Design a protein with these regions (language model features):
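Bacterial N-terminal signal peptides that target proteins for export
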Residues: 1-14
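Bacterial N-terminal signal peptides
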Residues: 11-24
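Mature N-terminal, pre-catalytic/accessory segment of carbohydrate-active enzymes
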Residues: 17, 28-59
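Substrate-binding cleft and catalytic face of glycoside hydrolase catalytic domains
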Residues: 70-284
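Catalytic-core region of carbohydrate-active enzymes that cleave or remodel glycosidic bonds
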Residues: 275, 280-355, 365-381, 418-420, ...
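Carbohydrate-binding surface patches
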Residues: 395-436, 469-473
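Solvent-exposed beta-hairpin/edge-strand motifs
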Residues: 430-448
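C-terminal beta-strand-rich structural cap/linker in extracellular carbohydrate-active enzymes
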Residues: 455-480
């Protein structure tokens, strides 16, 4: 039998052990507390347009609307809409003849290719039958118009597959006949979409990554600048002659990430485009964004919009959680003020491209939505549309956060944790809102932008758990 002394000592030992365990746990927990105090001074506004580049396996407006995008980028050009010379006579009609009488163009060809494309698909040029979406260009553009989603169309003579073969002779254009064909194609595209029809397509890109030979441009930088000048003349003629009350935008120079072509374009042809548009696949897009902004400063494009026409990935699956979280961080970076700011963007790409070896999109075969889709959707909820932005007074080294206010004065708080460590976050948004109920959404390996609970503000403060490798979005409804 144990003596009373031994029993007492054993009991005390157990108490000490329990106390140490509890203390240890509490100490560890305390180390994982982060306090975020949001400034009451607006830093600026969030990115106005967040959209996606098309993919060829599908086009379903329900995906675009559920994702919340308000712009959609489309690869136009000769391979898609003029795979054969539309009139069969190279170099005819001339630019002056078209300006005098636009009906000299073979509009029967354009009506047919836009309405009854080969193999029943506007993507016939990019994939095998049975692997691409079934539908025509009319459906795409009319659907975007009805949904108030802003299309941005790239016009190319030759695509990344160096097609169509007949257009190789004007890649780059050299002769008068070459320039006639290029001018006619640009004119016909813009005229068909906006004059012959009314699809409200007012954003135009001239080629795609002209500094990347794999994308089909066969000329030099100087040749590309001439291509832009002639395209500008064709586009400008359509609007001044037939759409005098409409504003159009030419995006340029549409170059690869890290390229120095934008600097040259801003010096040599700044009056032939009005929206600076570059590609940027960096993990942190802000570094190159700042460089391009620096080039814009001191030119006539200093106050012009800056768009990122492609970002995200074409190498890694959008099912990757780390990549998905970084999408949210880059959306936040694009809404930061000053030289980090991005006016509009298109992630590459919404849908898979059906050709073997090409990129995965946010949405795969059978409508499967990947993690990146839900991550971007969360970022769009908080940031798209030019909302007033507010950032932490002191930035956390571990978390990235931003708050926004929408037109109804509701407040959004978005916090991203791309580390394995979990946190308790004490958020102070008292400078923006004092009381209100918050709906909490979580993005993580377990929750894909799903509602997980509610919070009530107390004096503008709220606490919540933030799991490792996750993001939280809280929408606080303004009480009347």
């Amino acid at each position: 039998m144990l003596s009373k002394t031994r029993i007492l000592n054993l009991f005390l030992g157990i108490l000490i052990a329990l106390s140490l365990e509890l203390f240890s746990g509490t100490t560890t927990f305390a180390q994982n507390i982060e306090t975020i105090k949001i400034s009451g001074t607006a830093a600026g506004i969030s990115t106005r347009y967040i959209g996606a580049v098309e993919g060829n396996i599908n086009f379903d407006i329900k995906d675009l609307q559920d994702l919340g995008i308000n712009t959609y980028r489309i690869y136009g050009g000769m391979s898609r809409w003029e795979a054969e010379d539309d009139d069969g006579k190279y170099g005819w009609p001339s630019i002056d003849e078209i300006k005098t009488n636009p009906n000299i163009i073979n509009w029967a060809h354009w009506d047919r290719i836009m309405t009854d494309p080969p193999q029943g698909s506007d993507y016939w040029w990019s994939g095998q039958p049975g692997t691409v979406w079934q539908g025509n260009a009319r459906t795409i553009f009319n659907t975007l118009k009805q949904a108030n989603i802003r299309p941005v169309v790239s016009i190319r003579n030759v695509d990344s597959g160096w097609k169509p073969s007949w257009a190789l002779q004007l890649n780059p254009p050299r002769t008068g006949e070459d320039w006639n064909e290029w001018w006619e194609h640009v004119f016909a595209t813009v005229y068909w979409l906006n004059v012959r029809n009314d699809y409200r397509v007012d954003d135009w890109e001239i080629h795609n990554e002209p500094d990347n030979r794999d994308q089909g441009w066969g000329g030099t930088r100087a040749d590309y600048f001439e291509l832009v000048k002639v395209a500008k003349d064709a586009i400008d003629f359509v609007y001044k002659t037939y759409l005098p009350d409409r504003t159009y935008r030419i995006h340029g120079p549409k170059t690869v990430g890290g390229s120095n072509w934008p600097e040259a374009a801003l010096q040599e042809i700044p009056n032939y485009f009005d929206t600076v548009n570059v590609h940027n696949y960096d993990a942190d897009i802000s570094n190159y964004t700042r460089k391009v902004r620096g080039w814009m400063n001191g030119t006539v494009r200093a106050n012009s919009q800056l768009w990122v026409g492609e970002w995200g990935t074409y190498e890694i699956s959008y099912g990757d959680l780390s990549l998905a979280l970084n999408l949210i961080k880059n959306v936040i970076r694009g809404s930061q003020p000053g030289d980090n700011y991005i006016d509009g963007s298109h992630i590459f790409c919404l849908y898979d491209w059906g050709k073997l070896g090409l990129a995965e999109g946010l949405v795969g075969e059978g409508g499967k939505r990947r993690a990146g889709y839900y991550a971007l959707r969360m970022g769009i909820r908080a940031l798209q549309g030019g909302k007033a932005t507010f950032f932490p007074i002191t930035n956390s080294s571990d978390l990235m956060a931003v708050a926004t206010i929408d037109a109804s004065k509701n407040v959004y708080l978005l916090v991203v944790n791309d580390r394995a460590t979990s946190y308790t976050v004490n958020a102070d948004i008292s400078e923006l809102i004092k009381t209100g109920n918050g709906t909490v959404r979580e993005f993580s390996s377990q929750r894909m932008d799903e509602v997980v609970g509610n919070l009530r503000l107390k004096g503008g403060n709220a606490s919540f758990a933030l799991a490792g490798n996750s993001a939280i979005l809280i929408k606080f409804d303004r009480q009347n």
